C-alpha cells in the first residue's frame, strides 16, 4: 500500500507533481526512492539523503517550470561519506556543519563534494583509488550555499551510540543464522 501524504497548499503544484513522478532525475518515483533509502538504511544502519536543485539562469518560477528545473534527491551510502562534522547550537541541538562525500569514482579519479553552511565545493582528485591517495586535488566548482544549511538528512535504521552511525539489521540476521546453524548441528549430533 503506497503511503498517503498531505501536501496542503502545494497539492496539484506542477513542480511537486514532477518531483513525485521523478524524484532523483533518473526516472524513479518518490515512493521508489524512499523505498531504496529504507532498504539501504536497513543494510548499512544509515544512509544519507541530499536534496539539491540545479543551478539555473532562470529569473522566474515560470522559467524554471519551462526548463524543468526543480529539486531532486540523491542517496549516499556510508562508504561514500568521507567526513562530517556536527556542532551544537546555542539551543543545545546538534546540527551538521560539514559533509564531504564521494560523488563519483573511477580508475583515474574521484569527484568529491564538500558541503558547508557557506559553500558547496566540488573537487576532482586524481589517483583516488590508491590507499592514502596522494593524488592532486583540483577545485572544479565552488558555489555559495543559498540556504545556509547543509541539505542532507541522515536516515537511520536504528540509532547507534555514535552520531551519525546507525545499527544494521544484518547484525541480527547473522546471530540468527549462527543460532540456526548451531541448532542443526546439535540435532545432527543427537541423531548420530
Question: What does each model-identified segment do?
Answer:
Residues 38-43, 87-92, 188-191:
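A general structural signal for short secondary-structure junctions and capping/turn motifs
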Residues 134-192:
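Extended, charged amphipathic alpha-helical segments
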Residues 16-23, 30-33, 38, 99, ...:
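Generic structural signal of hydrophobic/aromatic residues within well-ordered alpha-helices
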